[in-house]
Amino acid sequence: MKPLPWRWRLGAAALATLAVAGCILEEPILPLEELQDWPPINSAIPKDKAIEAKVDALLASMSLEEKVGQMTQVEIAEVTPDEIRQYHIGSVLNGGGSFPGQNKAATVNDWLALADSLWAASMDPSNPHQIPLIWGTDAVHGHNNVRGATMFPHNIGLGAARAPNLMKRIAEVTAREVAATGIDWAFAPTLAVVRDDRWGRTYEGFSENPEITAAYGGKIIEGLQGALAKDARPNERVVATAKHFIGDGGTDQGKDQGVTIVTEHELLNIHARGYFPALNAGAQTVMASFNSWQDKAAGEGAKAYKMHGNKYLLTDVLKTKMGFDGFIVSDWNGNGQLTTGNSNSPRNCSNSDCPEAINAGIDMVMVPYRDEWKAFIANTIASVRSGEIPQARIDDAVRRILRVKYRAGLFTKPKPSARLVNHEIGTEENRAVAREAVQKSLVLLKNNGNVLPLPRKAKILVAGKSADSLSNQNGGWSLSWQGTGNTNADFGGGTTLWGAVQKIAPNAVLDTSTTGALANNTFDAAIVVIGETPYAEGLGDIGKTKTLELAKLRPEDITLIDALKAKGVKKIVTVLYSGRPLYANKELNRSDAFVAAWLPGTEGDGIADVLFRTKAGKVNVDFNGKLSYSWPGAACQTPLNVGDAGYAPQFAYGYGLSYAQGGTVAALDETSADIGCGVTSGGGTADTPISFFDRGNADGWNMKVAAPSKWSGVVIAQASSASTSTPNGEITATPVDDKSGIQWSAIKAKWNNAEGQLYIQSAVEAETQNLQPYLNAGGALVFDARVSVAPTAPVKARIDCVYPCIGEIDVTTAIQALPVGNWTEVAIPLQCFADKGTDFTAINTPLLIYSSGQFELSVGNVRWEPNRAGNVPCDGASADPVTVLDAPRDVYVNGIADPALFDVPGSWSYGSGSIALNANFDDAGEKVVDVTYNGLKEGGGNGSIFFPVKSPNLFDVSAVAATGGVQFELRVLDYGGSTQPFWVKLVCARKPDTCRTGDLTTLVGRPALGVWTTVQLP
């Protein structure tokens, strides 16, 4: 092995320099050596002959039904003890925001009672075999789903602490609290190395640099698991999960569940580095990631494989080459995302039917919902009996699951409530560890004039929306999935920053206003607590139309700071809560001191410990934190990672001031970006979709319901299964899974035989946006729709420019034509609304659906797309015209056969070169399509021609799908210098990622020159 390239050694060099300057590291973060291949695992929990013999004996006597049951993981709200017995269920989980009895205030005893009942069902003597259930939970910053638990800083803050041994202690506390509630398994740690801070899960990663992730991975596994059943305190240990395997932090533009485009060498040396120490420490489970991997070395046209179906990485690499002998669990319905286009599956998967995921190496399948997990069990059994899933693959999966259960001591442990004498959580001792973690995670970006630390007797104004908010202080994955909908009381413990300050600063005053109502020139300083509000996966992504600029993402914060300064407050100390580095130059310039506090958890005392002096006026606790993520100096300076070419951040990786080593920050550039980081200027026309609701509200927009009892509207509660209604119940909205099966990512509206509307509106109702470029670009309003109950009254669609400025069309017929129970993409041309009066320069309501009577409609992924044809005409007459193909139909024979159904042939290419296409070339009196490929670089898929269906038509080919196909004739006149064969595929242009055959590379090959060759595409 040789040292890693300079871009990775730079981080270690920066750390070494800081250490010399006086920052004493708890344990050094060592540089990594470059790897050339996937290393073998030397697990701290090796195979045990006695356990293997027990597994062999049990496995040999199990039925297929029992085995598939062991491979099934279901949600606690979607299963009963009787079903555990009947279906031999091997595992349950509680999703974010799911509690015993769906009671957020559930006590430890409530959790234990449920754990006991589920465990007892699995161990019932009437079962053919008594195989203990294993319960998993997302304990990602402490036991964060449980009221009263200790919640630690999220991983982004822990990365700044640079304290590997502290990580082990944090994991030990987490394990004790998880075990105290009767749960056996923590879905942690997250080992993502985050490369684009727009990702909504950035805060779940310790660093952009794999060195920190590698230093932490093994320590956390040691703290959670210990030696499991062989540990000195086995009942205080839980099974750990290394997740999400692999590349989740590297997706293009930071898109959650997107595509990571890197070489295998980069995957190995960047994204995998945390896994090696974690697996060596004995991690017993690995969770597959939602993302896809596209091998950059294979070229731009290479297939992007979903990790849930990536046999090479899950089986060939992780299990075979590395020797991992625990089990791989899928993520929430991740198996259902496999298609022919993103895997080797011969068919598109569903949540309840996906042999490809199991064949690829998934051992336990997370299928949360009752109807789907029951169907999954039946379908999987059928697939084994048909030979689609080999029996040996099932046996391997179950062997791994049983092995882990034996290693964890689950076969010999008593019922969950009897395993520990003390079931306390959130103890003073545990919170002290979290308080220490907060102290060490804070990064001091600015301290001009040594404003900090503050004297305890100074007159201090504590202001900002987050000053007295445990919800904002904790962020996502806190009680609820997204961390939203929580009050301070819901946490059942913990201290806000204001709560901490008032303990030690007798002259401090809390101002909860947004305008600094209590501020005046008698205040020595203001502590202004600002930043992001809670979010988690998907909903936290910064989309293409947004930037990293804090002043635009959270304009209320800079407004408050300006108000405080205008009212004469002498010094401004800004404390930023955020799950990512942000471009905050405007806020930095207006602050005398600026602290990046990340998402510190429940123990706000840890912040006050560092901000204030002792009673004697001395430094109490110095700043320790150093940036584990580079800090941007421009609104769109992303991706930004240490070692990048032209690396020039505002504050570099490893930066962090202290009281011992201070410094002055000069005035910073405040340039804003006019367009989003993923948008290119279109000269008055948009060229990038704008999202208003995608698995949750986009920044600056709220989905609401309204009715006569409250026309001003009610914001829909999201990220849980709780419903939101208008006061008199005219319309009710409930989060449901979207078309991809992603939890609570769409909204189902139910009109209860009354007038009501579902709509998206600016968070500030009167605030408008100039979205004229989308109209100029021939755009459409697009959303996913699923009708559960067809409307009994007219349905209207509207786009408003602040009521009564509206444009409304009747879409009743189109909605009635949608298939009941199935998701359909609806697209309405924006011009329809412009024709009815919408002023697109002042939009505040980009979607409104109005009806009365009985009607149930689910809506998801609401956006405007430029250059998008509609499938609902402006008169709302119908949805896409569907043409049933039940007999042969000509597409192009001596020209386009039916111009009403088929459009003219087109071409596509990338890279150098071009394509010349003549769709009406005269070949001896007959029209043919003549194509010349000019100078295209070598490599598959660099240029293509296509024959499109004319928008807005759709074809129903189900009648001929089994036996039919597409036939065409091809004559090659000259191959030129190309050595590549022809490839062919079928693609649904509107859904290219989910509806395509994939590249068929051998069907055409290289036909002989000068003769017509017939090709049949099944």
Residue positions per predicted region:
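Generic cytosolic/nucleocytoplasmic N-terminal low-complexity/intrinsically disordered segments
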Residues: 1, 66, 569-570, 917-919, ...
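Bacterial N-terminal signal peptides that target proteins for export
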Residues: 2-11
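Bacterial N-terminal signal peptides
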Residues: 11-21
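Non-membrane alpha-helical secondary structure
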Residues: 12, 43, 47, 619, ...
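Glycoside hydrolase catalytic-domain context in secreted enzymes
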Residues: 23-691, 700
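Beta-rich carbohydrate-recognition modules and glycan-binding surfaces
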Residues: 678-1018
